[in-house]
């Protein structure tokens, strides 16, 4: 569980797996054609300084479409820092890790198993007991984020063919997902719009 394995915020990847940093910067038109996404280990779905709708929303949508089509790609975020800057109110990437663990190996394992969180503050943990999904929110104390009461959060569970919206206290039977085996969980404040997205959780494989 998360309390036994503390979550680490990644500040830099070092010698990282192969990353697709979505080339949609506002002032620069980088374009490329990728025919084999199996070569990519993760996609930077948020670059914090970039505009939400013009850039980052496209990154989120691309990642969702690839994952739900069966690609094993993790989600991360970034911040193009060229000096001192506040990270208050921005997304960060979190992974599970041990206090004295090998961070490089833990990052590699998290990436290759899609076990990353991209969040502004609260982390959404999803539990699968073999019959239903249930949920826990962990507040990280991240600077710039003011926690809400649990009932003010909404969760979406997106599959290839459906979108289920629920609350943190709900249990969602696995039979709700019909034939879908891949689920993307996200946590929102009050309303399930991208402006209110506070956490993208690890992909669930049933």
Show the residue positions of the predicted features.
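Domain-core and long-helix interface of multi-subunit machines
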Residues: 1-89, 130-131, 135, 156-157, ...
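C-terminal functional module detector
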Residues: 69-74, 79-206
């Amino acid at each position: 569980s998360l309390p036994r394995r503390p979550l680490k915020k990644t500040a830099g990847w070092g010698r990282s797996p192969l990353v697709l940093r979505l080339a949609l910067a506002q002032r620069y038109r980088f374009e490329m054609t990728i025919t084999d996404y199996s070569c990519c280990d993760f996609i930077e779905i948020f670059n914090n300084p970039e505009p939400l709708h013009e850039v980052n929303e496209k990154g989120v949508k691309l990642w969702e479409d690839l994952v739900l089509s069966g690609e094993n790609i993790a989600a991360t975020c970034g911040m193009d820092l060229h000096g001192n800057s506040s990270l208050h109110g921005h997304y960060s990437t979190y992974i599970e890790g041990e206090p004295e663990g090998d961070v490089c190996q833990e990052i590699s394992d998290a990436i290759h198993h899609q076990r990353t969180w991209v969040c502004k503050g609260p982390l959404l943990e999803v539990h699968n007991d073999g019959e239903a999904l249930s949920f826990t929110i962990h507040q990280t104390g991240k600077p710039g984020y003011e926690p809400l009461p649990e009932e003010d959060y909404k969760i979406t569970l997106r599959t290839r063919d459906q979108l289920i919206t629920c609350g943190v206290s709900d249990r969602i039977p696995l039979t709700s997902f019909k034939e879908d085996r891949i689920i993307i969980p996200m946590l929102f404040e009050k309303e399930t719009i991208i402006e209110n997205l506070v956490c993208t959780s690890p992909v669930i494989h049933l």
